[in-house]
Protein backbone atom coordinates (compact mmCIF):
# COMPACT_ATOMS: atom_id res chain seq x y z
CA UNK A 1 0.00 0.00 0.00
CA UNK A 2 2.77 2.40 0.95
CA UNK A 3 4.66 1.48 -2.21
CA UNK A 4 1.55 2.18 -4.30
CA UNK A 5 1.05 5.56 -2.61
CA UNK A 6 4.69 6.40 -3.16
CA UNK A 7 4.49 5.56 -6.85
CA UNK A 8 1.28 7.54 -7.21
CA UNK A 9 2.83 10.55 -5.51
CA UNK A 10 5.93 10.29 -7.70
CA UNK A 11 3.75 10.06 -10.79
CA UNK A 12 1.76 13.12 -9.71
CA UNK A 13 4.93 15.12 -9.03
CA UNK A 14 6.35 14.06 -12.40
CA UNK A 15 3.14 15.09 -14.15
CA UNK A 16 3.12 18.48 -12.43
CA UNK A 17 6.78 18.98 -13.31
CA UNK A 18 6.03 18.09 -16.93
CA UNK A 19 3.14 20.55 -17.06
CA UNK A 20 5.24 23.27 -15.44
CA UNK A 21 8.05 22.68 -17.94
CA UNK A 22 5.62 22.78 -20.87
CA UNK A 23 4.13 25.99 -19.51
CA UNK A 24 7.59 27.55 -19.38
CA UNK A 25 8.62 26.30 -22.82
CA UNK A 26 5.33 27.22 -24.51
CA UNK A 27 4.04 30.26 -22.62
CA UNK A 28 0.50 31.51 -23.04
CA UNK A 29 0.43 34.11 -25.87
CA UNK A 30 -1.39 36.85 -24.00
CA UNK A 31 -2.17 40.01 -26.00
CA UNK A 32 0.56 42.62 -26.06
CA UNK A 33 0.22 46.31 -26.88
CA UNK A 34 -0.68 46.23 -30.57
CA UNK A 35 -0.97 50.03 -30.98
CA UNK A 36 -4.76 49.88 -31.44
CA UNK A 37 -6.11 53.07 -29.88
CA UNK A 38 -9.46 54.81 -29.47
CA UNK A 39 -9.61 58.54 -28.73
CA UNK A 40 -12.64 59.39 -26.59
CA UNK A 41 -14.69 62.47 -25.85
CA UNK A 42 -15.36 63.36 -22.23
CA UNK A 43 -18.53 61.22 -22.16
CA UNK A 44 -16.79 58.19 -23.69
CA UNK A 45 -17.98 58.73 -27.26
CA UNK A 46 -15.29 57.57 -29.73
CA UNK A 47 -13.81 60.48 -31.67
CA UNK A 48 -11.13 58.71 -33.68
CA UNK A 49 -9.62 55.26 -33.81
CA UNK A 50 -6.20 53.93 -34.69
CA UNK A 51 -6.29 50.33 -35.88
CA UNK A 52 -3.63 47.77 -35.14
CA UNK A 53 -1.23 46.44 -37.79
CA UNK A 54 -4.00 44.23 -39.21
CA UNK A 55 -6.55 47.05 -39.38
CA UNK A 56 -8.56 45.79 -36.40
CA UNK A 57 -10.57 48.23 -34.29
CA UNK A 58 -11.04 47.54 -30.57
CA UNK A 59 -12.63 49.51 -27.75
CA UNK A 60 -11.46 47.91 -24.47
CA UNK A 61 -14.11 47.30 -21.81
CA UNK A 62 -14.48 45.36 -18.58
CA UNK A 63 -17.43 43.12 -17.60
CA UNK A 64 -18.72 45.91 -15.37
CA UNK A 65 -18.96 48.27 -18.36
CA UNK A 66 -21.38 46.19 -20.42
CA UNK A 67 -25.09 45.63 -19.88
CA UNK A 68 -25.69 42.86 -17.30
CA UNK A 69 -28.28 41.24 -19.57
CA UNK A 70 -25.65 40.95 -22.31
CA UNK A 71 -23.50 38.87 -19.97
CA UNK A 72 -26.57 36.80 -19.10
CA UNK A 73 -27.29 36.16 -22.78
CA UNK A 74 -23.66 35.38 -23.56
CA UNK A 75 -23.10 32.92 -20.74
CA UNK A 76 -26.49 31.23 -21.13
CA UNK A 77 -25.94 30.68 -24.84
CA UNK A 78 -22.22 29.94 -24.87
CA UNK A 79 -21.21 28.54 -21.49
CA UNK A 80 -23.71 28.17 -18.64
CA UNK A 81 -21.11 26.57 -16.36
CA UNK A 82 -18.34 29.07 -17.08
CA UNK A 83 -17.75 29.89 -13.42
CA UNK A 84 -17.83 26.23 -12.33
CA UNK A 85 -15.71 24.27 -14.83
CA UNK A 86 -11.87 24.29 -15.02
CA UNK A 87 -11.85 25.55 -18.62
CA UNK A 88 -13.17 22.37 -20.22
CA UNK A 89 -16.69 21.06 -19.65
CA UNK A 90 -16.56 17.24 -20.03
CA UNK A 91 -20.35 16.92 -20.00
CA UNK A 92 -20.75 19.49 -22.77
CA UNK A 93 -18.07 17.77 -24.86
CA UNK A 94 -19.72 14.38 -24.38
CA UNK A 95 -23.16 15.73 -25.26
CA UNK A 96 -21.85 17.50 -28.36
CA UNK A 97 -20.02 14.36 -29.47
CA UNK A 98 -23.13 12.20 -29.08
CA UNK A 99 -25.33 14.71 -30.92
CA UNK A 100 -22.86 15.01 -33.77
CA UNK A 101 -22.47 11.23 -34.10
CA UNK A 102 -26.21 10.67 -33.94
CA UNK A 103 -26.94 13.32 -36.51
CA UNK A 104 -24.11 12.36 -38.84
CA UNK A 105 -23.03 15.99 -38.97
CA UNK A 106 -21.90 18.80 -36.69
CA UNK A 107 -25.02 19.64 -34.70
CA UNK A 108 -23.42 21.44 -31.75
CA UNK A 109 -20.04 22.18 -30.28
CA UNK A 110 -18.75 21.67 -26.79
CA UNK A 111 -16.40 24.62 -26.64
CA UNK A 112 -16.45 26.63 -23.45
CA UNK A 113 -15.87 30.36 -23.35
CA UNK A 114 -12.34 29.66 -22.11
CA UNK A 115 -11.73 27.39 -25.12
CA UNK A 116 -12.97 30.10 -27.48
CA UNK A 117 -10.61 32.62 -25.90
CA UNK A 118 -7.77 30.11 -26.31
CA UNK A 119 -8.61 29.84 -30.01
CA UNK A 120 -8.73 33.63 -30.36
CA UNK A 121 -5.30 34.02 -28.75
CA UNK A 122 -3.66 31.13 -30.60
CA UNK A 123 -5.58 30.07 -33.73
CA UNK A 124 -5.26 26.39 -34.63
CA UNK A 125 -6.37 23.90 -37.23
CA UNK A 126 -9.42 21.66 -36.79
CA UNK A 127 -7.23 18.56 -36.73
CA UNK A 128 -6.77 16.39 -33.65
CA UNK A 129 -3.43 18.09 -33.01
CA UNK A 130 -5.15 21.46 -33.27
CA UNK A 131 -7.82 20.46 -30.75
CA UNK A 132 -5.17 19.20 -28.33
CA UNK A 133 -3.35 22.50 -28.69
CA UNK A 134 -6.60 24.34 -27.90
CA UNK A 135 -7.12 22.22 -24.78
CA UNK A 136 -3.58 22.97 -23.63
CA UNK A 137 -4.01 26.71 -24.13
CA UNK A 138 -7.34 26.53 -22.29
CA UNK A 139 -5.71 24.92 -19.28
CA UNK A 140 -3.01 27.58 -19.33
CA UNK A 141 -5.66 30.30 -19.36
CA UNK A 142 -7.33 28.83 -16.30
CA UNK A 143 -3.99 28.50 -14.49
CA UNK A 144 -2.78 32.02 -15.15
CA UNK A 145 -5.96 34.11 -15.26
CA UNK A 146 -9.08 34.57 -13.20
CA UNK A 147 -12.52 33.94 -14.68
CA UNK A 148 -13.08 37.69 -14.83
CA UNK A 149 -9.86 38.17 -16.81
CA UNK A 150 -10.81 35.40 -19.24
CA UNK A 151 -14.25 36.95 -19.71
CA UNK A 152 -12.64 40.35 -20.28
CA UNK A 153 -10.44 38.87 -23.01
CA UNK A 154 -13.52 37.49 -24.74
CA UNK A 155 -15.38 40.79 -24.49
CA UNK A 156 -12.48 42.56 -26.20
CA UNK A 157 -11.31 39.93 -28.71
CA UNK A 158 -14.47 38.24 -30.00
CA UNK A 159 -14.96 38.85 -33.76
CA UNK A 160 -17.97 40.94 -34.79
CA UNK A 161 -17.49 41.17 -38.54
CA UNK A 162 -14.95 42.85 -40.74
CA UNK A 163 -12.29 44.61 -38.70
CA UNK A 164 -14.39 44.84 -35.53
CA UNK A 165 -13.28 43.00 -32.42
CA UNK A 166 -15.04 43.19 -29.09
CA UNK A 167 -18.56 44.00 -28.02
CA UNK A 168 -17.84 47.69 -27.38
CA UNK A 169 -16.41 48.29 -30.86
CA UNK A 170 -19.45 46.55 -32.35
CA UNK A 171 -21.88 48.51 -30.19
CA UNK A 172 -20.39 51.85 -31.21
CA UNK A 173 -19.96 50.89 -34.88
CA UNK A 174 -23.44 49.42 -35.42
CA UNK A 175 -25.53 51.21 -32.80
CA UNK A 176 -23.65 54.41 -31.98
CA UNK A 177 -23.84 53.79 -28.23
CA UNK A 178 -21.86 52.10 -25.44
CA UNK A 179 -22.43 48.40 -24.64
CA UNK A 180 -23.87 49.39 -21.27
CA UNK A 181 -26.97 50.65 -23.13
CA UNK A 182 -27.76 47.53 -25.16
CA UNK A 183 -31.41 46.52 -25.24
CA UNK A 184 -32.30 42.89 -24.50
CA UNK A 185 -32.73 42.20 -28.22
CA UNK A 186 -29.37 43.76 -29.05
CA UNK A 187 -27.71 41.84 -26.23
CA UNK A 188 -29.05 38.55 -27.60
CA UNK A 189 -27.83 39.42 -31.10
CA UNK A 190 -24.36 40.35 -29.92
CA UNK A 191 -24.17 37.14 -27.87
CA UNK A 192 -24.45 35.00 -31.02
CA UNK A 193 -22.82 37.24 -33.64
CA UNK A 194 -19.21 36.10 -32.96
CA UNK A 195 -20.21 32.51 -33.87
CA UNK A 196 -20.44 33.48 -37.55
CA UNK A 197 -19.63 37.19 -37.87
CA UNK A 198 -19.62 37.21 -41.68
CA UNK A 199 -22.78 35.16 -42.17
CA UNK A 200 -24.68 36.93 -39.38
CA UNK A 201 -23.40 40.45 -39.97
CA UNK A 202 -26.57 42.46 -39.26
CA UNK A 203 -25.96 45.29 -41.70
CA UNK A 204 -25.64 42.79 -44.57
CA UNK A 205 -27.71 39.77 -43.53
CA UNK A 206 -30.48 41.06 -41.22
CA UNK A 207 -32.74 38.01 -41.67
CA UNK A 208 -30.01 35.53 -40.72
CA UNK A 209 -29.01 37.76 -37.83
CA UNK A 210 -32.59 37.91 -36.55
CA UNK A 211 -33.02 34.13 -36.78
CA UNK A 212 -29.83 33.59 -34.77
CA UNK A 213 -30.90 36.21 -32.22
CA UNK A 214 -34.29 34.57 -31.76
CA UNK A 215 -32.58 31.24 -31.12
CA UNK A 216 -30.70 32.85 -28.24
CA UNK A 217 -33.92 34.37 -26.92
CA UNK A 218 -35.66 30.98 -26.95
CA UNK A 219 -32.83 29.48 -24.93
CA UNK A 220 -33.02 32.35 -22.43
CA UNK A 221 -36.75 31.70 -22.16
CA UNK A 222 -36.20 27.97 -21.64
CA UNK A 223 -33.90 28.63 -18.69
CA UNK A 224 -36.10 31.49 -17.38
CA UNK A 225 -33.15 33.88 -17.39
CA UNK A 226 -35.31 36.78 -18.57
CA UNK A 227 -38.98 37.42 -17.88
CA UNK A 228 -41.61 36.53 -20.51
CA UNK A 229 -42.22 40.24 -21.02
CA UNK A 230 -38.55 40.89 -21.75
CA UNK A 231 -38.41 37.93 -24.13
CA UNK A 232 -41.57 39.05 -25.93
CA UNK A 233 -40.39 42.62 -26.37
CA UNK A 234 -37.01 41.42 -27.62
CA UNK A 235 -38.63 39.09 -30.17
CA UNK A 236 -40.77 41.97 -31.46
CA UNK A 237 -37.79 44.30 -31.86
CA UNK A 238 -36.59 44.37 -35.48
CA UNK A 239 -32.92 44.08 -36.37
CA UNK A 240 -32.37 47.62 -37.61
CA UNK A 241 -28.70 48.47 -37.40
CA UNK A 242 -27.09 51.34 -39.24
CA UNK A 243 -24.28 50.58 -41.68
CA UNK A 244 -20.97 50.41 -39.89
CA UNK A 245 -19.74 53.79 -38.78
CA UNK A 246 -16.21 54.59 -37.72
CA UNK A 247 -15.39 57.57 -35.50
CA UNK A 248 -14.15 60.48 -37.59
CA UNK A 249 -13.89 63.51 -35.30
CA UNK A 250 -10.93 65.63 -34.11
CA UNK A 251 -8.29 63.88 -36.25
CA UNK A 252 -5.49 66.34 -35.51
CA UNK A 253 -6.06 66.13 -31.77
CA UNK A 254 -6.09 62.34 -32.05
CA UNK A 255 -2.80 62.43 -33.93
CA UNK A 256 -1.34 64.74 -31.31
CA UNK A 257 -2.29 62.50 -28.37
CA UNK A 258 -1.46 59.16 -29.96
CA UNK A 259 2.03 58.26 -28.83
CA UNK A 260 4.04 55.10 -28.40
CA UNK A 261 3.18 54.89 -24.70
CA UNK A 262 -0.45 56.03 -24.99
CA UNK A 263 -3.12 53.83 -23.38
CA UNK A 264 -5.58 51.88 -25.51
CA UNK A 265 -8.29 54.38 -24.53
CA UNK A 266 -7.13 57.99 -24.89
CA UNK A 267 -9.56 60.16 -22.96
CA UNK A 268 -10.03 63.84 -23.80
CA UNK A 269 -12.10 66.74 -22.49
CA UNK A 270 -13.91 67.26 -25.80
CA UNK A 271 -17.67 67.59 -26.23
CA UNK A 272 -18.45 65.22 -29.11
CA UNK A 273 -21.69 66.95 -30.14
CA UNK A 274 -20.05 70.40 -30.19
CA UNK A 275 -17.06 69.03 -32.10
CA UNK A 276 -19.34 67.51 -34.73
CA UNK A 277 -21.37 70.72 -35.17
CA UNK A 278 -18.27 72.86 -35.56
CA UNK A 279 -16.66 70.46 -38.04
CA UNK A 280 -19.82 70.59 -40.15
CA UNK A 281 -19.85 74.38 -39.86
CA UNK A 282 -16.21 74.71 -40.90
CA UNK A 283 -16.66 72.36 -43.86
CA UNK A 284 -19.58 74.52 -44.97
CA UNK A 285 -17.29 77.54 -44.98
CA UNK A 286 -14.49 75.87 -46.92
CA UNK A 287 -15.68 77.07 -50.32
CA UNK A 288 -15.71 80.68 -49.09
CA UNK A 289 -12.07 80.61 -47.98
CA UNK A 290 -9.33 81.82 -50.33
CA UNK A 291 -7.40 79.15 -52.17
CA UNK A 292 -4.67 77.40 -50.13
CA UNK A 293 -6.18 78.84 -46.94
CA UNK A 294 -7.20 76.80 -43.92
CA UNK A 295 -8.85 77.69 -40.62
CA UNK A 296 -8.82 76.54 -37.00
CA UNK A 297 -11.23 76.63 -34.05
CA UNK A 298 -10.35 76.08 -30.40
CA UNK A 299 -13.14 76.19 -27.81
CA UNK A 300 -12.01 76.22 -24.17
CA UNK A 301 -13.93 76.44 -20.90
CA UNK A 302 -11.96 79.25 -19.27
CA UNK A 303 -12.65 78.28 -15.66
CA UNK A 304 -10.82 74.96 -15.88
CA UNK A 305 -9.21 75.31 -19.35
CA UNK A 306 -10.82 72.09 -20.57
CA UNK A 307 -10.83 72.02 -24.38
CA UNK A 308 -14.37 71.40 -25.64
CA UNK A 309 -13.67 71.53 -29.39
CA UNK A 310 -10.42 71.17 -31.32
CA UNK A 311 -10.35 71.82 -35.06
CA UNK A 312 -6.78 72.24 -36.23
CA UNK A 313 -7.69 72.65 -39.91
CA UNK A 314 -10.67 72.71 -42.25
CA UNK A 315 -10.18 69.11 -43.40
CA UNK A 316 -7.23 66.85 -42.65
CA UNK A 317 -7.60 65.26 -46.10
CA UNK A 318 -7.55 68.58 -48.02
CA UNK A 319 -3.99 68.74 -49.32
CA UNK A 320 -4.59 71.97 -51.24
CA UNK A 321 -5.26 73.70 -47.93
CA UNK A 322 -2.48 71.88 -46.06
CA UNK A 323 -5.10 70.17 -43.93
CA UNK A 324 -2.48 67.99 -42.26
CA UNK A 325 -1.03 71.08 -40.50
CA UNK A 326 -2.42 71.58 -36.99
CA UNK A 327 -2.89 75.35 -36.85
CA UNK A 328 -3.73 75.22 -33.15
CA UNK A 329 -0.25 73.98 -32.31
CA UNK A 330 1.66 75.54 -35.21
CA UNK A 331 3.68 78.74 -35.04
CA UNK A 332 1.85 81.56 -36.83
CA UNK A 333 1.82 85.33 -36.78
CA UNK A 334 -0.43 86.55 -33.96
CA UNK A 335 -1.35 89.72 -35.85
CA UNK A 336 -2.86 92.23 -33.44
CA UNK A 337 -3.93 89.69 -30.80
CA UNK A 338 -1.09 90.70 -28.44
CA UNK A 339 -2.34 94.26 -28.06
CA UNK A 340 -4.68 93.60 -25.08
CA UNK A 341 -1.77 92.08 -23.15
CA UNK A 342 0.40 95.14 -23.80
CA UNK A 343 -2.30 97.58 -22.71
CA UNK A 344 -2.93 95.52 -19.56
CA UNK A 345 0.77 95.45 -18.68
CA UNK A 346 1.02 99.20 -19.33
CA UNK A 347 -1.90 99.76 -16.94
CA UNK A 348 -0.14 97.68 -14.28
CA UNK A 349 3.10 99.58 -14.85
CA UNK A 350 1.36 102.95 -14.41
CA UNK A 351 2.24 104.09 -17.93
CA UNK A 352 -1.39 104.74 -18.86
CA UNK A 353 -4.93 104.67 -17.58
CA UNK A 354 -7.96 103.84 -19.67
CA UNK A 355 -8.43 107.44 -20.87
CA UNK A 356 -4.78 108.36 -21.44
CA UNK A 357 -4.21 110.04 -24.81
CA UNK A 358 -2.07 108.23 -27.36
CA UNK A 359 -1.04 109.48 -30.78
CA UNK A 360 -2.40 107.79 -33.88
CA UNK A 361 -0.17 109.69 -36.27
CA UNK A 362 2.45 108.60 -38.85
CA UNK A 363 5.84 108.00 -37.31
CA UNK A 364 9.09 106.36 -38.31
CA UNK A 365 11.14 104.23 -35.92
CA UNK A 366 14.45 103.97 -37.72
CA UNK A 367 13.76 101.80 -40.75
CA UNK A 368 10.42 100.70 -39.32
CA UNK A 369 7.37 102.69 -40.43
CA UNK A 370 4.13 101.05 -39.26
CA UNK A 371 0.70 101.93 -40.60
CA UNK A 372 -2.91 101.13 -39.73
CA UNK A 373 -4.89 98.31 -41.30
CA UNK A 374 -7.35 100.88 -42.60
CA UNK A 375 -5.93 103.85 -44.47
CA UNK A 376 -5.66 107.10 -42.53
CA UNK A 377 -4.91 108.17 -38.96
CA UNK A 378 -7.10 109.41 -36.11
CA UNK A 379 -4.73 111.75 -34.32
CA UNK A 380 -4.97 111.86 -30.49
CA UNK A 381 -7.12 108.99 -29.16
CA UNK A 382 -7.77 107.55 -25.72
CA UNK A 383 -6.12 104.28 -24.77
CA UNK A 384 -9.56 102.67 -24.62
CA UNK A 385 -10.45 103.81 -28.15
CA UNK A 386 -7.04 102.84 -29.50
CA UNK A 387 -7.37 99.31 -28.16
CA UNK A 388 -11.04 98.89 -29.09
CA UNK A 389 -10.25 100.02 -32.66
CA UNK A 390 -7.02 97.99 -32.77
CA UNK A 391 -5.03 100.99 -33.98
CA UNK A 392 -1.43 100.16 -34.80
CA UNK A 393 0.45 103.42 -34.18
CA UNK A 394 -0.67 103.87 -30.55
CA UNK A 395 0.27 100.24 -29.83
CA UNK A 396 3.76 100.73 -31.25
CA UNK A 397 4.10 103.97 -29.26
CA UNK A 398 3.06 102.13 -26.09
CA UNK A 399 5.44 99.23 -26.74
CA UNK A 400 8.31 101.66 -27.21
CA UNK A 401 7.58 103.08 -23.76
CA UNK A 402 7.11 99.67 -22.12
CA UNK A 403 10.02 97.96 -23.87
CA UNK A 404 9.81 95.10 -26.40
CA UNK A 405 12.20 92.91 -24.44
CA UNK A 406 10.28 93.41 -21.21
CA UNK A 407 6.98 92.71 -22.97
CA UNK A 408 8.24 89.47 -24.54
CA UNK A 409 9.75 88.39 -21.23
CA UNK A 410 6.52 88.90 -19.28
CA UNK A 411 4.56 87.03 -21.94
CA UNK A 412 7.01 84.13 -21.73
CA UNK A 413 6.79 84.05 -17.94
CA UNK A 414 2.99 83.80 -18.20
CA UNK A 415 3.11 80.91 -20.69
CA UNK A 416 2.66 82.90 -23.91
CA UNK A 417 6.13 82.73 -25.50
CA UNK A 418 6.94 84.42 -28.80
CA UNK A 419 9.05 82.75 -31.46
CA UNK A 420 11.79 84.84 -33.06
CA UNK A 421 14.57 84.01 -35.53
CA UNK A 422 17.78 82.69 -34.01
CA UNK A 423 19.76 85.41 -32.19
CA UNK A 424 17.04 88.00 -32.92
CA UNK A 425 15.93 90.40 -30.18
CA UNK A 426 12.30 91.45 -29.63
CA UNK A 427 11.56 94.70 -31.45
CA UNK A 428 8.61 97.02 -32.01
CA UNK A 429 7.22 94.86 -34.84
CA UNK A 430 6.19 92.09 -32.44
CA UNK A 431 3.08 94.00 -31.36
CA UNK A 432 1.79 93.91 -34.96
CA UNK A 433 2.50 90.24 -35.60
CA UNK A 434 6.25 90.34 -36.20
CA UNK A 435 6.85 87.16 -34.19
CA UNK A 436 5.49 83.64 -34.04
CA UNK A 437 3.01 82.28 -31.52
CA UNK A 438 0.63 79.35 -31.10
CA UNK A 439 -3.14 79.66 -31.00
CA UNK A 440 -3.39 77.47 -27.91
CA UNK A 441 -0.97 79.72 -26.00
CA UNK A 442 -2.82 82.85 -27.10
CA UNK A 443 -6.05 81.30 -25.82
CA UNK A 444 -4.28 80.57 -22.54
CA UNK A 445 -3.27 84.23 -22.36
CA UNK A 446 -6.76 85.51 -23.12
CA UNK A 447 -8.01 83.38 -20.26
CA UNK A 448 -6.45 86.01 -17.97
CA UNK A 449 -9.12 88.51 -19.02
CA UNK A 450 -11.86 86.22 -17.67
CA UNK A 451 -10.02 84.88 -14.62
CA UNK A 452 -8.62 87.86 -12.74
CA UNK A 453 -5.39 88.15 -14.72
CA UNK A 454 -4.33 84.49 -14.52
CA UNK A 455 -3.28 82.84 -17.76
CA UNK A 456 -3.24 79.04 -18.01
CA UNK A 457 -2.37 76.18 -20.32
CA UNK A 458 -5.16 74.40 -22.15
CA UNK A 459 -6.15 70.97 -20.82
CA UNK A 460 -6.71 68.30 -23.46
CA UNK A 461 -7.23 65.37 -21.09
CA UNK A 462 -9.27 65.04 -17.88
CA UNK A 463 -6.28 64.16 -15.71
CA UNK A 464 -4.16 67.10 -16.89
CA UNK A 465 -3.54 69.59 -14.05
CA UNK A 466 -4.65 73.22 -14.24
CA UNK A 467 -1.43 75.26 -14.53
CA UNK A 468 -2.01 78.97 -13.91
CA UNK A 469 0.41 81.87 -14.19
CA UNK A 470 -0.07 85.55 -13.45
CA UNK A 471 -0.21 87.70 -16.60
CA UNK A 472 -2.08 90.80 -15.41
CA UNK A 473 -3.42 92.18 -12.16
CA UNK A 474 -7.13 91.56 -11.50
CA UNK A 475 -7.81 95.28 -11.97
CA UNK A 476 -6.12 95.67 -15.34
CA UNK A 477 -7.68 92.40 -16.55
CA UNK A 478 -11.13 93.79 -15.67
CA UNK A 479 -10.43 97.09 -17.46
CA UNK A 480 -9.17 95.38 -20.63
CA UNK A 481 -12.16 93.04 -20.67
CA UNK A 482 -14.52 96.00 -20.31
CA UNK A 483 -12.81 97.83 -23.18
CA UNK A 484 -12.97 94.81 -25.49
CA UNK A 485 -16.60 94.19 -24.57
CA UNK A 486 -17.48 97.59 -26.00
Predicted regions and their residues:
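Juxtamembrane regions of bacterial inner-membrane/periplasmic proteins
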Residues: 1-291, 302-308, 313, 361
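Flexible glycine/proline-enriched surface loops and loop-helix/loop-strand junctions
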Residues: 53-57, 133-138, 196-202, 259-263, ...
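Active-site SXXK
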Residues: 74-75, 220, 278, 304-305, ...
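Short, well-structured active-site flanking segments
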Residues: 83-93, 165-168, 228-231, 321, ...
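Conserved catalytic neighborhood of penicillin-recognizing serine enzymes
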Residues: 102-126, 180, 243-258, 352-407, ...
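Glycine-rich, acidic and aromatic/proline-enriched surface loops and short helix-turn segments
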Residues: 119-123, 156-163, 180, 184-196, ...
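Mid-domain, small-residue-enriched loop/turn segments at the edges of structured enzyme/sensor domains
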Residues: 135, 369-372, 403-446
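A penicillin-recognizing enzyme superfamily signal
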Residues: 268-288, 299-301, 310-313, 317-327, ...
